[in-house]
Amino acid sequence: PFYCNYALTNYSDRKARAILDDVVHQILQTDLRTYDKTTGLWKHAWDETHSQFWANQGNGQSRHTWARALGWYVMAIMECLDVMPNDYPRKAELVALLQKTMQAVVQNQDKNSGVWYDVMDVKSPKNYLESTASCMFSYVLLKGSRQGWLSSDFREAGKRAYQGILQRFIRVNNDLTLSLTDCCSVSGLGPGKGPFVPKGKENYRRDGSFDYYMSEPIRDNDPKGIGPFIWASLEMEQYNAQ
């Protein structure tokens, strides 16, 4: 989104249009490289060389769909749409991609709670409902429908997610402040050996396995969840004011 905004603010129409084309290209390449036809979801990452220890040697994809990675992706698509001019001809390509991704997100929404599991393509008692990605998805569903890029059915899914967030993840503390619980603190992949990795800084624990994701700490009030929760709350406030 910053790349789009900077181009539109500082460059001529022709140069800004070329930068918007680059933004669309990058987003579509991410779809092409990380989409998994078997699950209908997007993998956490892709290695162009197919050589990293966490990557599938055939297609370069990591093993699983990490919910927050997909949350970052769909938020980026939507925020780029938000700043792209309506007469930009390739805007429709991103609208179609947003609809495709959010359809898959809704299909993987937990039926009981309305929120999402940390690793979206694994059904296991060890998996857990995770708040930061759930806030991201709720925000995109609510804002995307308000902006007309997603249908009203998606708004209903976003409202259900928001209620699930309030019920499952929001704790009222003794001093009457709020806490957002069940935040994945961090997850990543590697790095392994490489020309830009200092010797001794490799991290082979982060191998992209399900057990790896489950080994990362869970905390309260991670800013990567608080921000999207505030944004989703503002969307609900606008909806309720109608």
Model-derived regions, located:
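Solvent-exposed loop and edge beta-strand segments that line ligand/cofactor-binding
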Residues: 54-75, 86, 90, 109, ...
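Extended glycan-interaction surfaces of carbohydrate-active proteins
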Residues: 38-63, 83, 111-123, 183-217
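CBM-like carbohydrate-recognition segments
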Residues: 123, 129, 133, 138, ...
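Well-ordered alpha-helical scaffold segments within catalytic/enzyme domains
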Residues: 1-15, 72-90, 135-150, 228-241
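A structure-centric feature marking long, well-folded core domains of fungal metabolic enzymes
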Residues: 14, 54, 73, 99, ...
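Active-site cleft segment of glycoside hydrolase catalytic domains centered on the general acid/base Glu
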Residues: 7-18, 27, 56-60
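Long, well-ordered core segments of solenoidal/helical folds
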Residues: 20-43, 48-54, 95-113, 157-175
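Short helix-capping and hinge/turn segments at secondary-structure transitions, especially at repeat
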Residues: 78, 82-89, 99-114, 121, ...
